[in-house]
Design a protein with these regions (language model features):
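Local beta-strand N-terminus motif with an aromatic residue
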Residues: 35, 102-103, 119
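Generic beta-sheet signal
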Residues: 68-70, 108, 125
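N-terminal active-site segment of His-dependent metallophosphoesterases
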Residues: 1-67, 73-79
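Short catalytic/ligand-binding loop motif for oxyanion handling, primarily in non-cytosolic enzymes
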Residues: 75-77, 113-116, 122, 130-133
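Active-site-proximal loop/helix segment associated with metal-binding centers of metalloenzymes
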Residues: 121-156
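Beta-strand-turn-beta hairpins that frame and shape the catalytic cleft
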Residues: 2-10, 110-124, 145
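Binuclear metal-ion centers of metallo-dependent hydrolases, dominated by the metallo-beta-lactamase
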Residues: 89-91, 95-113
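Short, flexible/disordered intra-domain loops and linkers
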Residues: 77-88
Length: 156
């Protein structure tokens, strides 16, 4: 997948559109050029309906939107959310949603940006949580995983 002509690749993260003020800010975001791409790199929202709202809005405004999940998309337990999914099933549901909207994901071939200068391959990497960043009071990976299990949030 390639782009043509001029334009800019923009990146944004931590939209948290479940908060009304953040929704208002996102509604004001516009591409500068018809060729602009937007990389949405995590924490769009907790609820699938909010993620869909945001990505739909952005695909109407940017030539190409590329999404990478953050912890809020994947690890937030959504009480009352229509999707009601966790883990891999939740991720696959979000990838399917992105495909319906024309949004690229880590599961798609890497797109190539061809603006001014040399071509640039955009690699939306989905990297798992690293337990070498351990909670206070844990000293080994096993202790960190046990702590995570006790809180109901295991990210591996």
């Amino acid at each position: 997948m390639t782009s043509a002509g001029t334009g800019t690749v923009w990146a944004i993260s931590d939209l948290h559109v479940g908060h009304a003020d953040n929704r208002t800010v996102l509604q004001s975001l516009r591409a500068v050029s018809e060729q602009d791409w937007l990389l949405v790199v995590g924490d769009v929202a907790d609820r699938v309906a909010d993620i869909e709202w945001a990505l739909r809005l952005l695909t109407d405004r940017f030539r190409r939107v590329v999404w990478v999940p953050g912890n809020h998309e994947l690890w937030t337990e959504e009480r009352g959310d229509a999707a009601g999914l966790r883990g891999q099933a939740r991720y696959e549901h979000l990838v399917a949603l992105c495909r319906r909207l024309g949004v690229l994901t880590p599961e798609d071939p890497y797109p190539v940006w061809r603006g001014d200068g040399e071509p640039v391959t955009v690699a939306p990497l989905f990297l798992l949580y690293d337990y070498t960043f351990r909670p206070t009071g844990t000293h080994t990976q096993a202790e960190a995983l046990e702590y995570a299990r006790s809180t109901g949030v295991v990210c591996s």
